Design a protein with these regions (language model features):
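A short beta-strand motif that forms the metal-chelation/ATP-contact edge
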Residues: 196, 263-273
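Peripheral (often C-terminal) accessory segments that flank ATP-dependent C-N-forming ligase machineries
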Residues: 294-387
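Haloarchaeal acidic low-complexity proteome signature biased toward cell-envelope/secretome components but also
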Residues: 1-10, 28, 50, 197, ...
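ATP-binding N-terminal substructure of ATP-dependent carboxylate-amine bond-forming enzymes
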Residues: 1-102, 106-107, 133
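A conserved helix-loop-beta module that forms one wall/lid of the active-site cleft
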Residues: 99-161, 166-167
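Active-site "cap" helix and flanking loop/linker of ATP-utilizing ligase/carboxylase catalytic domains
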Residues: 236-253, 270-319
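Internal nucleotide-binding/catalytic subdomain
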Residues: 159, 163-254, 258-260
Length: 387
């Protein structure tokens, strides 16, 4: 039986960006306190968390301090050092969820794909890359183009380089600047994602989201995805198979390709709340952030039932160069029924930096996802980033 006391449990979060901020916002109504560790003073999460430890993500002293102040540790960024977290968890007795072993698997995309393929999860053909000849061999086997990926350090599309021909192999490899892998290019109908939650002896999945990317950056998520019922069920099956491989409680963002012939292939996994799940704050009974809080604490999971069709659009830094973050012309968002603005509190705007998002939910029975998408795009276009 779950019991609350005052003060309630404390979650220590490695990372203090927008995900940590929204975790802290979801934790507060449950009586749960959050302390974050982040190298940036006054990071977005620090504005709502109980406290911030200013330290690098792999700083052993900082993570030890975090562990000693928390009942459980989690992370909102894959740059967390799994070896440091594992060692400090063992020394302090503060559990980590998801487990550091899962973080280790996720850190290296080649290791990730091999483990998932061995478990029967459908993935695009791939191979390790030691030199440009490996890329050329992949083009021989898979056809052009292929996708070159940095094995470590890449997220939000960073470190992904399409290679159009053998002549481009050398330059592409130099641009990745580190260990790499290459995948066949997937001819997809749409990109989708399942936000899945692993709790104590229970699993939950949120409604399938359809994702629109530009320049490898998520722009929009549309829910429910415009996929067939059969494809949707297959996506859930693949997500559950992925959770079997992952070790530890928490939310997992599982990105998938829906191919033109109706198959589902795994793209990538994030062992944390995911940008393509931000819509759940308004769109479902329990948000992905509250689910993560519940899951890592070992509490019962909440309902993932859809409240209404929903569209989320990111607010990306529409600036030429870095400068103070100011968002203008937000009146239309504030005046639109069903629209919700989330501003992350980042002090500096940079080109294409995720500064916030807008969610639009159906205001009536006649609102289709296409109508909501049009509204969301209009609202995103109306705001301005001011110098």
């Amino acid at each position: 039986m779950t019991t609350l006391r005052t003060p309630g449990p404390t979650i220590g979060v490695v990372g203090g960006g927008q995900l940590g901020r929204m975790l802290a916002e979801a934790a507060a109504p449950l009586g749960v306190e959050v302390v974050v560790l982040d190298p940036t003073p006054d990071c977005p999460a620090a504005l709502v968390a109980r406290d911030q430890i200013v330290a690098d993500f792999d700083d052993e002293a900082g993570i030890r301090d975090l562990a000693e102040r928390a009942d459980i540790l989690t992370f909102e960024i894959e740059l967390a050092d799994q070896n440091v977290m594992d060692r400090i968890s063992e020394e302090t007795g503060t559990p980590v969820h998801p487990k550091p072993s899962t973080l280790e698997t996720i850190h290296d995309k080649l290791v990730q794909k091999r483990e998932l393929e061995d478990a029967g999860v459908p993935v695009p053909p791939f191979r390790a890359v030691d030199d440009a000849d490996d890329i050329r061999a992949a083009i021989d086997d898979y056809g052009a183009p292929v996708m070159l990926k940095a094995r470590t350090g890449g997220y939000d599309g960073r470190g992904n380089v399409p290679v159009e021909s053998k002549a481009d192999a050398e330059d592409a490899l130099e641009s990745v600047a580190g260990p790499a892998m290459v995948e066949s290019f997937v001819d997809f109908e749409r990109e989708v994602s399942v936000i899945a939650v692993k709790g104590d002896d229970e699993v939950a999945t949120f409604p399938l989201g359809e994702n629109v990317h530009e320049d490898e950056i998520l722009r929009e998520t549309i829910v429910p995805a415009r996929s067939s019922e059969a494809v949707t069920e297959r996506a859930y099956d693949v997500a559950r198979d992925v959770l079997e491989v992952m070790d530890g409680r928490g939310v997992y963002g599982i990105e998938l390709f829906e191919t033109t012939d109706g198959e589902i292939l795994l793209n990538e996994i994030a062992p944390r709340p995911h940008n393509s799940g931000h819509w759940t704050i308004e769109g479902t009974q329990t948000s992905q952030f509250e689910q993560h809080v519940r899951a890592v604490l070992g509490w019962p999971l909440g309902s993932t039932a859809l409240r209404s069709p929903t569209v989320m659009t990111n607010l990306l830094g529409d600036v030429e160069e870095e400068g103070p973050a100011q968002l203008g012309d937000i009146d239309e968002i504030l005046e639109t029924p069903g629209a919700s603005l989330h501003w992350y509190g980042k002090h500096q705007a940079r080109p294409l930096r995720k500064m916030g998002h807008v969610t639009v939910t159906a205001d009536g029975d006649d609102d289709s996802v296409d109508d909501l998408l049009e509204t969301a795009r209009d609202l995103e276009a109306a705001v301005t980033f001011q110098p």
